[in-house]
């Protein structure tokens, strides 16, 4: 259930790309989109950050340095609220002069830029032909030329360094995997039923209809791609990259361009629902052979200089990255089967010896977004004390007598999130956010980690609005530990006044409350409406060591709930906090937290808001899809009467305490949320109303676990603040 972290994602959902960026069915080219993100005279005069102002912001991403480090290509997405869609364009920055040039206009979506090895050509995805295909253009300027011309959309791609081959991802119908009645009964073409014999009927936001993402390799000649070869297998019902996020960072060419490494979870049905066992596979172009490097027949795995044979790597293994000499493949690995939030270890596979070495055995944090600087140096991003920082790891020489790996060096510091980075030509550029700043580019000094801002995509907006400040607060918990809590203050904060205050409950549950900028749960937006926001890093979040992270499993109703209350009680002692006007809000696991706190808050709060939260543990077990998550975090199934951890979890399900509910609650859900299905919201709404509690149900018929579409987002925020204003801000 852990939400996808932006530091891990090159792209998010295909559905989001199709509907929010304006592709619709992904078969018709959208009409050109008029972009006007200038603030109105009224917005400038008010100087207030509002949902409508937020949707005028440009969203930067996709930063890629040229091979010599002298140029930086990236994307910016702008939205038209009235049209309810956005458009993405490519931009190019000259690193020496700072000059920025827009490469594509707003008549089509242009995403996922990548450089050729010589730095002369830019490849990218575009829907300008009517479907999403690979295009290329001269980096110096010129008209784009089409590289692929397939009937179906290309959902991701990569050109090898020699420039003679391209991998691409497409959704294909797998023979024998049909799940739709019209496919199974050809004489009943208007029938609409999904038919299943095993689990995983639904995943995240879609029904399994027998269509899977497959990985293809095609020859590339004179800038044109031939028909590709499906290296997964045309009759294989597996996804590459893995479902449900389909992150193309899970696929990587070797530098010689002769091999392709990728991630796959080769399971189906009940096995898929119960397991996190994905592996790294390597396809050899010359022989056509594929090898699973995580489970070789005679594999050897090295941990702390000890070699163990036949270690199966039963958890998530993802994100292969080749060393410059192609001898090694670095990847991220989780040791515990079925535990999706386990420590992300940084592993190194030796292509000569098949040995796998754990490079971060003593590092108590995740290692994400891994990149090689040279054959002996790795860089990665790690969550550390409520922030994301850039780290460097020096490796011993292959022939060194002592093969012990030193601890990584944390290069950057400060209250920010480094969400992605690109490095080339001795230069590093990072995409950085804070709770007061949407994504911008910063150059990172590799020696001392100093950040120098490069971009200012939303300067015209920041210049005309007032944002509050963010304070770091360490709160003592009930068991004597210190908990980092972010406190976001309203603009023009006056400590002599009293402010309504919100407790924010994080989702995941294993997701850090960091310096992220969110377009869904935006703390700056909440503060701009006059609320103080209290955001604790309660038990169960990463970036504070494994003990802090793992405590929550099997203890949802325990210490982390007490942590929430410690945070709000600590802030409520401040003279500027109006303890008679407190609210509590959260999504996903945070929504569960809201439901649980509604039954035990002892009249602290005047209102609750739960978005896509778990209400009834027993019905949730039969409604969700990735059962490995519940089995690990609840402890097992509700029928395991001899399992004390599971029985304790189910005994403390929020629905068991509805008789104690006494506070107005707003309940929000998405009808395409198959992780925490909307039926959980219906149960909670029914319980609240039958107990005479003021309640409101908001169900978005075209959203899933999160709300992405522009107008839906504005409605979400209007409902959110309308509820809080009525029951918290205006409380008597």
Please provide the spans of the model-predicted regions:
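C-terminal motif of bacterial Sec signal peptides marking the signal peptidase cleavage site
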Residues: 23-25
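Conserved beta-propeller blade repeats
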Residues: 57-72, 107-125, 144, 151-169, ...
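Short, solvent-exposed loop/turn segments at conserved positions within beta-propeller repeat blades
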Residues: 82-87, 127-132, 207-211, 271-278, ...
């Amino acid at each position: 259930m852990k939400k996808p972290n932006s530091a891990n994602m090159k792209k998010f959902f295909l559905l989001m790309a199709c509907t929010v960026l304006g592709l619709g069915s992904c078969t018709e080219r959208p009409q050109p989109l008029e972009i006007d993100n200038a603030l109105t005279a009224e917005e400038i005069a008010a100087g207030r950050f509002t949902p409508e102002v937020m949707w005028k912001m440009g969203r930067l991403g996709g930063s890629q340095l040229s091979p010599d480090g002298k140029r930086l290509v990236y994307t910016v997405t702008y939205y038209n609220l009235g049209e309810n869609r956005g458009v993405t364009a490519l931009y190019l920055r000259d690193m020496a002069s700072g000059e920025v040039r827009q490469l594509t206009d707003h008549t089509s979506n242009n995403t996922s830029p990548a450089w050729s090895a010589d730095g002369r050509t830019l490849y990218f995805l575009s829907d300008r032909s009517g479907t999403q295909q690979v295009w290329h253009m001269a980096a110096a300027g010129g008209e784009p030329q089409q590289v692929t011309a397939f009937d179906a959309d290309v959902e991701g791609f990569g050109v090898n360094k020699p420039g003679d081959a391209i991998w691409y991802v497409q959704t294909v119908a797998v023979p024998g995997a049909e799940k739709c009645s019209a496919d199974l009964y050809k004489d009943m073409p208007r029938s609409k039923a999904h038919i299943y014999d095993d689990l995983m009927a639904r995943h995240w936001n879609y029904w399994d209809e027998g269509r899977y993402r497959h990985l293809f390799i095609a020859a590339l000649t004179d800038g044109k791609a031939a028909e590709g070869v499906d290296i997964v297998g045309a009759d294989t019902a597996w996804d590459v990259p893995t479902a449900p996020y389909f992150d193309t960072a899970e696929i990587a060419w070797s530098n010689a361009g002769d091999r392709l490494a990728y991630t796959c979870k080769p399971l189906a049905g009940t096995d898929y629902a119960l397991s996190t066992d994905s592996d790294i596979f390597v396809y050899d172009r010359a022989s056509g052979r594929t090898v699973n490097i995580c489970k070789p027949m005679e594999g050897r795995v090295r941990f702390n200089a000890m070699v163990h044979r036949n270690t199966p790597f039963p958890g998530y293994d993802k994100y292969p990255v080749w060393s410059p000499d192609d001898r090694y493949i670095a990847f991220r690995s989780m040791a515990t089967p079925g535990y999706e939030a386990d420590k992300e270890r940084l592993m190194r596979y030796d292509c000569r010896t098949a040995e796998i070495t754990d490079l971060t055995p003593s590092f108590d944090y995740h290692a994400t977004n891994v990149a090689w600087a040279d054959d002996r140096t790795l860089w990665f991003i790690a969550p550390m004390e409520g922030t994301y920082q850039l780290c460097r790891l020096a490796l011993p020489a292959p022939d060194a007598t002592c093969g012990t790996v030193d601890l990584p060096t944390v290069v950057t510091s400060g209250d920010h999130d480094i969400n992605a980075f690109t490095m080339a030509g001795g230069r590093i550029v990072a995409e950085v956010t804070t709770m007061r700043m949407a994504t911008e580019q910063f150059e990172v000094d590799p020696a001392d980690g100093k950040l120098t801002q490069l971009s200012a995509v939303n300067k015209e907006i920041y210049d005309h609005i007032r944002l509050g400040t963010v304070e770091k607060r360490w709160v003592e918990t009930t068991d004597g530990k210190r908990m980092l809590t972010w406190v976001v203050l309203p603009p023009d904060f006056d400590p002599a006044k009293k402010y309504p205050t919100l407790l924010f409950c994080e989702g995941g549950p294993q997701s850090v409350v960091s310096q992220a900028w969110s377009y869904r749960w935006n703390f700056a937006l909440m503060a701009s409406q006059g609320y103080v926001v209290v955001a604790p890093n309660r038990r169960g979040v990463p970036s504070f060591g494994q003990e802090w992270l793992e405590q929550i499993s099997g203890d949802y109703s325990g210490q982390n709930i007490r942590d929430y209350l410690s945070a709000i009680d600590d802030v409520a002692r401040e003279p500027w906090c109006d303890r008679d006007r407190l609210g509590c809000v959260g999504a996903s696991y945070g929504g569960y937290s809201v439901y649980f706190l509604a039954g035990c808050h002892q009249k602290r709060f005047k209102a609750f808001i739960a978005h896509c939260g778990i209400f009834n543990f027993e019905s949730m077990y039969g409604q969700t899809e990735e059962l490995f998550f519940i089995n690990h975090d609840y402890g097992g199934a509700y029928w395991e009467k001899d399992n004390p951890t599971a029985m304790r979890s189910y005994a403390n399900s929020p629905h068991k305490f509805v008789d104690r509910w006494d506070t107005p609650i707003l309940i929000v859900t998405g009808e395409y949320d198959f992780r925490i299905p909307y039926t959980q919201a219906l149960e909670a709404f029914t319980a609240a109303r039958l107990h005479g509690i003021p309640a409101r149900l908001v169900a978005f018929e075209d959203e899933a676990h999160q709300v992405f579409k522009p107008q839906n987002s504005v409605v979400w925020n209007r409902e959110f603040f309308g509820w809080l204003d009525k029951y918290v801000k205006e409380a008597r």
